[in-house]
Each structure stands twice: as C-alpha cells, then as structure tokens.
C-alpha cells in the first residue's frame, strides 16, 4: 500500500466554502490530492476538504528520515539548530519525522527555480522563476539555504529542482556546459521554430531575453524542466528564455530569422452563433487561446473579456481577460450542471460572469485585483 503523506499547517485557515476545511497552525493532516493549487487533505477527525497549498508543508516520511539519518552518520554531520523563522511542527515523540535540527551543509550545488517566491522574513531568499540558485544547506524541515545574486537566505525546497545528483556540483561548470550548448546551436544552425513576438517582454533576470512586439526569433531549445519557456535567439545573436505564450510560430518558416518576416495572420473573430452559449456577446465558441490573445491585444481594453470553448477539455470553457502586461486565462469546468472556477461554483455561466464583474477574478501578490469589466467588442 502506498505510504501516506503527512502535511503540517503553517497558519490558521478558516474555510470560506463547503468544500474547504478549517485548519489550525501546526495541525497534522493527511494529503489526499496535491494536483492543484488547493490541496485536498484529511484531519484527525476524518474530515476532508481543500486548503490553500501555501498554508501547509510536507513532512518527511519515515523512510526518508532513515535515509537522511544514515547519510548524516556516514558524512559525520552533527545536529545543529534549525533556522529560527521556521515553526517547530514535528513532535519529538513521533519517530515518523526527521528531527528538525538535522541538516546537510556545505553542499554548493546548483538548483533551477521552478516558481517565483517572495521572501516573507529577513532571513529568507526571494526566488525568480527560471534563475539558478546555489544550494548551501538542506534542512530536514523542507527549507534550504542558498545564494543568488549576492543574497543568501532560506527558501522552500519544493520551489526548485536540483540540476544534478552530485552534492558537490560545480555551478560554473554547469553554466559553461549551457554556454557550450548555445554555441553549438549557433554553429549548427539548428532551429526548431521561427517565432514572432505578439507583444513586448522585459526580462526580470539574466537568463531571460528582452524583445519587442513584432521581433522575429529562432527557437533553439524547449527546456523539459520548464515547458512554459522556450530558449530563443534574436537576429543580433542574443540568446535567452522567452515565455512561449508571448510568441506565435510563423506558418511559413524562413530558414533563418535573418530574413525579413511577414506579420502573422490573425482572422477577425466575433461572437459565435453556434455552441452552448450562442447569442451571448461574450461567447466566442471554438477559438484558440492564440486567437483570443490576438483579438484582445488588437481590439481590447483592460478588463475586456471573452469566453471560449476549452481546447484541452471538450466540455469545459476558458475565460480570456485583457490585462496590463499579460493577458489572463481562467479554466471553467462543467461538472454535471455546475460551472466551477477554482473552488467556486455557479449554476449558470451568466451567474459566473456577473459575479466576477463585482468580485475580483484574480488578485496578484502585490494586491492588484482584476475584474471582468465588459465583453470584447
């Protein structure tokens, strides 16, 4: 039987809806489903429900505890005091947890950042998606200590992925290998696609590539560990990561991007006269995400939206919203006769639309709120 995964609440949370679950700080819970941003858990009273994933943290299993302990004994690493900003959640009497004081240090190994993380305490390190950090210490409570851009601090380990198996991995060597791969691509001229930018993009770190709307680039790599970003080369030879939803693959690919491109074609789309919500001015039926992006960028104003059939799930829908900088897309699932967006449920699509005209459909980490203002015209 599969080993059950235990998580511990980092903060109190009061359920806002029936499907959610009240939790208390330091409460132990059993993880049932972590496939979405809200995790389904079970408490000691055998009640189940959804909680925000950033309100809980995984605890190591007994098997992993044994492995860490054996490794620690082999390396001769002693117990040290854990970082004070992380709450002590493991009970000393429960041997299914690793002692929170155990850690591995002097690792000096590179890791790839999978998600953005904003430091909440002075001793934490903010992470930027797509960058590399040097892991210096690993604490058994799931927090690692590392350095980036001259800053040192703690961060949650599940926000990064290790580049290699060697604990003494050479970060400079890793960068050299990547640079060699880029040079190899330049020499061989291997181009996966030629793409054109739909709108401008300003990089937030050294690995990303700045570009303007209309720029043409060669796609030279599609990183497996970050499928939402492609490595591209501009006409001037500069290479970097670009968000793939900011570009469109040109239908008639030139052999190289040095040729003068023709602008990508985008058919004029309009509200659909067929489909589940035919006749509603916000329903565009079977249009692609790319077509929705193009229409919103060409004709829309901030807050304009449209609803389209989902490309990946035939019975579901997507809300596409014009937003400053980057448009947003929200999946709406049809479960029997109920329309679900995140944890919220609506009896009709019209009810969903009216709700998000009054309540924010998206709130950023900085507190920016986005609403459905009016349908695209």
From Swiss-Prot:
Phosphotyrosine sites (modified residues): 105
GO cellular component terms, semicolon-separated: cell-cell junction; cytosol; endoplasmic reticulum; nucleus; plasma membrane; protein phosphatase type 1 complex; ribosome; vesicle membrane
Main location: cytoplasm
Residue numbers bearing the Phosphoserine modification: 85, 91, 96, 166
GO molecular function: ephrin receptor binding; eukaryotic initiation factor eIF2 binding; molecular condensate scaffold activity; protein domain specific binding; protein kinase inhibitor activity; protein sequestering activity; receptor tyrosine kinase binding; signaling adaptor activity
Subcellular location as annotated: Cytoplasm; Endoplasmic reticulum; Nucleus
Keywords, in A-Z order: Acetylation, Cytoplasm, Endoplasmic reticulum, Nucleus, Phosphoprotein, Repeat, SH2 domain, SH3 domain, Translation regulation
UniProt GO BP: actin filament organization; antiviral innate immune response; cell migration; ephrin receptor signaling pathway; lamellipodium assembly; negative regulation of insulin receptor signaling pathway; negative regulation of PERK-mediated unfolded protein response; negative regulation of T cell receptor signaling pathway
Modification(s) after translation: Phosphorylated on Ser and Tyr residues. Phosphorylated in response to activation of EGFR and FcERI. Phosphorylated by activated PDGFRB.
InterPro entries, A to Z: NCK (IPR017304), Nck1_SH2 (IPR035882), Nck1_SH3_1 (IPR035562), Nck1_SH3_2 (IPR035564), Nck1_SH3_3 (IPR035565), SH2 (IPR000980), SH2_dom_sf (IPR036860), SH3-like_dom_sf (IPR036028)
UniProt cross-references to SMART domains, sorted A to Z: SH2, SH3
Entry-linked Pfam families: SH2, SH3_1
Residues where N-acetylalanine is found: 2
Domain SH3: 2-61, 106-165, 190-252
Boundaries of every SH2 domain copy: 282-376
Domain notes: Only the first and third SH3 domains seem to be involved in RASA1-binding; the second SH3 domain and the SH2 domains do not seem to be involved.
Description of how the protein assembles with itself and partners: Interacts (via SH2 domain and SH3 domain 2) with EGFR. Interacts with PAK1 and SOS1. Interacts (via SH3 domains) with PKN2. Associates with BLNK, PLCG1, VAV1 and NCK1 in a B-cell antigen receptor-dependent fashion. Interacts with SOCS7. This interaction is required for nuclear import. Part of a complex containing PPP1R15B, PP1 and NCK1. Interacts with RALGPS1. Interacts with CAV2 (tyrosine phosphorylated form). Interacts with ADAM15. Interacts with FASLG. Directly interacts with RASA1. Interacts with isoform 4 of MINK1. Interacts with FLT1 (tyrosine phosphorylated).
Function per UniProt: Adapter protein which associates with tyrosine-phosphorylated growth factor receptors, such as KDR and PDGFRB, or their cellular substrates. Maintains low levels of EIF2S1 phosphorylation by promoting its dephosphorylation by PP1. Plays a role in the DNA damage response, not in the detection of the damage by ATM/ATR, but for efficient activation of downstream effectors, such as that of CHEK2. Plays a role in ELK1-dependent transcriptional activation in response to activated Ras signaling. Modulates the activation of EIF2AK2/PKR by dsRNA.
Name used for this protein in its record: SH2/SH3 adapter protein Nck1
Gene from which this protein is expressed: Nck1
């Amino acid at each position: 039987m599969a080993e059950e995964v235990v998580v511990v609440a980092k903060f109190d949370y009061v359920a806002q809806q029936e499907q959610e679950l009240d939790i208390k700080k330091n409460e132990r819970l059993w993880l049932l489903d972590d496939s979405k941003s809200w995790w389904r858990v079970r408490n000691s009273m055998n009640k189940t429900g959804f909680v925000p994933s950033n309100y809980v943290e995984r605890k190591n299993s007994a098997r992993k505890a044994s492995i860490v302990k054996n490794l620690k004994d082999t390396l001769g690493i002693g117990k040290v005091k854990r970082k004070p900003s992380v709450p002590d959640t493991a009970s000393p009497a429960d041997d299914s947890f690793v002692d929170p004081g155990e850690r591995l240090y002097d690792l000096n190994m590179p890791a790839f950042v999978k998600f953005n993380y904003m430091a909440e305490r002075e001793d934490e390190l903010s992470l930027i998606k797509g960058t590399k950090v040097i892991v210096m210490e690993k604490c058994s409570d799931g927090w690692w200590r590392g350095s980036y851009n001259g800053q040192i601090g703690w961060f949650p380990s599940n926000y990064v992925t290790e580049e290699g198996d060697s604990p003494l991995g050479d970060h400079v060597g890793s960068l050299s290998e990547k640079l060699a791969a880029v040079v190899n691509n330049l020499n061989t001229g291997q181009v996966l696609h030629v793409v054109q930018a739909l709108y401008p993009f300003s990089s937030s770190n050294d690995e990303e590539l700045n570009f303007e709307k209309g720029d043409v680039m060669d796609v030279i790599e599609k990183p497996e560990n970050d499928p939402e970003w492609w490595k591209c080369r501009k006409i001037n030879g500069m290479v970097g990561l670009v968000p793939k939803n900011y570009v469109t693959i040109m239908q008639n690919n030139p052999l190289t991007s040095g040729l003068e491109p023709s602008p990508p074609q985008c058919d004029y789309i309009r509200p659909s006269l067929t489909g589940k919500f035919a006749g509603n001015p916000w329903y565009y039926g079977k249009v692609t995400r790319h077509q929705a992006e193009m229409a919103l960028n060409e004709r829309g104003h901030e807050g304009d939206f449209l609803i389209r059939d989902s490309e990946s799930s035939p019975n579901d829908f997507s809300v596409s919203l014009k937003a400053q900088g980057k448009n947003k897309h929200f999946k709406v699932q049809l479960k029997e006769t109920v329309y679900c967006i995140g944890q919220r449920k609506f009896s009709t699509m019209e009810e969903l639309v009216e709700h998000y005209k009054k309540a924010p459909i998206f709130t950023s980490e900085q507190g920016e709120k986005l609403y459905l203002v009016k349908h695209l015209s």
